[in-house]
């Protein structure tokens, strides 16, 4: 593929150096993270981060590893840059990686292959506010409409919405792992359209 990079050519860094570099870069508007994920690599967990520089039109990729069962908490990038929460929540959910100082580390999608099998919808950590004048309104995950199924939980005081919690991903059902089972571009396109909903 044009522009592809070999895995062996991706620079490997220490997490502390990556964290400190991102802490400064993400303060600038021209940088944003395109993807941040982890995957098993023997007895290790290998993390990949793809950073885009919109001003210079550059794609930067870095990787770091930690032992798969290492219980050392990583400093959370979400605490500094809230947009990182989806990436860190998915990594935490899939591999039980702890991110120190991460605000409200709730599960993202409950995939079938999640590491913490005790984490279920029955003990999902919904955000709560106590008060006699408050009420909750739950909508979904099945609702009339063409958008992706989702659960929406409103906490209201009269007609004012104080908090809205959105839970999406109900129709993914492990579709990401289906992509890895085929190299057929037509099959991959059909899978992508199947999860895209009204944006297909």
What are the language-model segments listed below?
Residues 138-200:
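Active-site- and interface-proximal helix/loop "cap" or "latch" segments in soluble metabolic
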Residues 1-164:
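Terminal low-complexity/charged segments
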């Amino acid at each position: 593929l044009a522009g592809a990079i070999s895995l062996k050519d991706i620079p490997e860094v220490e997490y502390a150096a990556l964290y400190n570099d991102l802490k400064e870069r993400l303060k600038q508007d021209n940088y944003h993270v395109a993807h941040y994920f982890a995957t098993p690599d023997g007895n290790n967990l290998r993390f990949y981060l793809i950073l885009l520089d919109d001003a210079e039109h550059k794609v930067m990729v870095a990787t770091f590893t930690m032992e798969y069962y290492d219980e050392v908490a990583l400093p959370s990038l979400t605490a500094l840059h809230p947009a990182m929460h989806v990436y860190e929540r998915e990594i935490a959910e899939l591999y039980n990686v702890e991110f120190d100082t991460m605000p409200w580390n709730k599960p993202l999608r409950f995939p079938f292959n999640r590491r913490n099998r005790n984490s279920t919808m029955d003990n999902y950590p919904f955000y709560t506010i106590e008060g006699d004048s408050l009420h909750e309104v739950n909508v979904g995950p099945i609702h009339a409409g063409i958008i992706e199924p989702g659960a929406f939980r409103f906490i209201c005081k009269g007609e004012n919405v104080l908090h809205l919690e959105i839970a999406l991903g109900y129709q993914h059902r492990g579709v990401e792992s289906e992509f890895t089972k085929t190299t057929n571009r037509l099959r991959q396109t059909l899978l992508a359209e199947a999860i895209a909903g009204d944006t297909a």
